[in-house]
């Protein structure tokens, strides 16, 4: 009996909570950057699940968003047009942390460059630094808009290719492996009986 196709159904069972969430995130990242490499058909049946996972990856917990987006999915089913909008907030908490850190020293270096030229006026370049510091916590919010054209940049591909690895530890404790574990003691028990027979032969 096939499962109900849409997550809004009360009998819907989503097996991809602990297994495919990192894959879905990585595929959505790659699909957003390289839409022609065949990632769209891979995520065709994941459209409903990818949107909330990306929108709620601001929170570190990956197990809670699926519980919340089950009722939300019924409303977001017609939301594939929102995908180009939703993956963006999912990418920014990852991207700005690494792209603004190299950018933050740059504004620090720019005022330092005029300092040796204007040694008698070291306080003037320091004053523009002070208003920049309170703005720095706001910078990850503001550059989100200019970061959108930066997303397709290839240097980010290793950044996102490395990020999905930490959430993957849930993959090893797959449920299909657990029913196999009792099979191994059974196979070990057979040689034990053979040993008793060997003892009898001895």
Curated annotation (Swiss-Prot):
User: Which GO terms fall under molecular function for this chain's record?
Assistant: structural constituent of tooth enamel
Q: Pfam families attached here?
A: Amelogenin
The record's subcellular locations are: Secreted, Extracellular space, Extracellular matrix
Q: Which residues carry this modification: Phosphoserine?
A: 16
Q: Where is this region: Disordered?
A: 77-202
Residue ranges with Low complexity bias:
101-112, 126-158
Single biological process term from Gene Ontology: enamel mineralization
Q: Where is the composition biased (Pro residues)?
A: 78-87, 113-125, 164-176
Q: What is its main location?
A: secreted
Write the record's keywords in alphabetical order, separated by commas: Biomineralization, Extracellular matrix, Phosphoprotein, Repeat, Secreted
Q: Which GO terms describe its cellular component?
A: collagen-containing extracellular matrix; extracellular region
The family annotation for this protein states:
Belongs to the amelogenin family.
Instruction: Report the function annotation for this chain.
Output: Plays a role in the biomineralization of teeth. Seems to regulate the formation of crystallites during the secretory stage of tooth enamel development. Thought to play a major role in the structural organization and mineralization of developing enamel.
Tell me what this protein is called. Answer: Amelogenin
Gene from which the chain derives: AMEL
């Amino acid at each position: 009996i096939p499962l109900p196709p849409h997550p809004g159904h009360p009998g819907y069972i989503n097996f991809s909570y602990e297994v495919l969430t990192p894959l879905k995130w990585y595929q959505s990242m790659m699909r957003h950057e390289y839409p022609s490499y065949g990632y769209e058909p891979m995520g065709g049946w994941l459209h409903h699940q990818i949107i909330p996972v990306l929108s709620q990856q601001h929170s570190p917990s990956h197990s809670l968003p699926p519980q919340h987006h089950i009722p939300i999915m019924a409303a977001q089913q017609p939301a594939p047009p929102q995908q180009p909008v939703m993956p963006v907030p999912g990418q920014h908490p990852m991207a700005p942390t690494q792209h603004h850190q190299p950018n933050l020293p740059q504004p620090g270096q720019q005022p330092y460059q005029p300092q040796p030229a204007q040694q008698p006026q070291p306080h003037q370049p320091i004053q523009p630094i002070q208003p920049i510091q309170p703005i720095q916590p706001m910078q990850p919010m503001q550059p989100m808009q200019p970061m959108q054209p930066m997303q397709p940049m290839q240097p980010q591909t290793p950044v996102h290719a490395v990020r999905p690895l930490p959430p993957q530890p849930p993959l090893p404790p797959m449920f299909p492996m657990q029913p196999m574990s009792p099979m191994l003691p059974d196979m070990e028990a057979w040689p034990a009986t053979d040993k008793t027979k060997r003892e009898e032969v001895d």
